[in-house]
Regions:
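Alpha-helical transmembrane segments and immediately membrane-proximal extracytoplasmic
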Residues: 1-311
Length: 311
């Protein structure tokens, strides 16, 4: 079972599935690390949390362990030194993932998104576009998260034969969409840079975003195994480019960063993690729009939390 899910994830990604690699990695690491809790004398949930965060840090090229993890021994009365000691396991896990990134796998590096002709987001009209993009991207992320389990229920109830026919049908949808545009294939991480570099028009961008949304829901509903962080980020980035083209804004990269963070934050319900990924993958000139987008995403999550399915 441990390696079955990981193998399914590899197959899904290898055949162009519009999903991220984090889900099979999480499944594998969580199962393996849970068996170490009695050796380390730490609760099973704690070991899994730290191990998953450490492995994701290596996957994304940045130590993520300290992002959004709360100590199980937290207390308002502790001083700074005691808090640091209590967070010792997170700190060690972060150092371990940083060592792997820099020493053992230096070639993965950190490759930031770029846009040659992009200007910085100003404090005037550009922030209005940031707010609009963040709201649109967060709403799209929310719609996808809500639609996926419903689509899965529909597939299970309406398609006879179990997993194989469901997988074939979703594969046909993915293949047909890829004929229209290959940008819908794979997670969307590298494809974000492609749409930043391309000169495709508004109509084509809308088609790409719509098809990416369709294949993401279809493949998850059809039993393909993978993560949603970068597919959602791609959808948010594509939405931002559509708005940037419509309003003729030159602050392309900042707007894309806002869409990236807003959509992924709502999708994974971890705004701090989405923001940290944005900080790593986008230059410092885009940090203000990303912070603004995170605030909007948090508001959307808070308002619609009851409607979001649990992880």
């Amino acid at each position: 079972l441990i390696f079955g899910r990981a193998g399914l994830g590899v197959v899904s990604l290898g055949f162009g599935g519009p999903l991220g690699p984090e889900a099979p990695l999480i499944a594998l690491v969580a199962q393996l690390s849970s068996r170490l809790s009695h050796i380390l004398r730490v609760t099973q949930a704690r070991v899994v949390e730290l191990s998953v965060a450490g492995s994701l840090g290596v996957l994304f090229g940045v130590p993520l362990v300290l992002a959004g993890i709360e100590s199980e021994e937290k207390s308002k009365n502790r001083n700074i030194g005691q808090r640091i000691v209590a967070r010792g396991p997170e700190i060690l896990a972060a150092i371990s993932s940083l060592f792997v990134i820099t020493k053992l796998l230096p070639e993965i590096g950190i490759h930031q998104f770029t846009s040659v002709n992009s200007a910085e987001v100003g404090f005037g009209i550009d922030l209005i576009w940031v707010a609009l993009i963040a709201l649109l991207a967060a709403s799209l992320g929310l719609a996808i998260v809500r639609a996926t389990p419903k689509a899965r229920e529909l597939v299970v109830s309406k398609i006879p034969g179990g997993a194989i026919p469901a997988g074939l049908l979703s594969g046909l949808i993915l293949g047909a969409s890829a004929v229209v545009t290959p940008l819908v294939l794979f997670s969307g991480h590298h494809e974000i840079q492609e749409i930043l570099d391309s000169t495709i028009g508004i109509g084509n961008l809308l088609v790409v975003v719509a098809l990416k949304t369709l294949v993401l829901i279809a493949c998850l509903a059809g039993g393909w195994y993978g993560g949603q962080i970068f597919p959602l980020a791609f959808i948010g980035a594509g939405t931002a480019l559509v708005v940037a083209e419509l309003v003729n804004s030159s602050a392309t990269l900042g707007l894309v960063a806002a869409g990236f963070v807003a959509a992924s934050a709502v999708g994974i319900r971890r705004p701090a993690l989405a923001l940290l990924l944005g900080f790593v993958l986008f230059p410092a000139t885009t940090w203000i729009p990303m912070l603004f987008a995170t605030v909007i995403a948090v508001a959307v999550i808070g308002k619609r939390s009851a409607e979001l399915p649990s992880h």
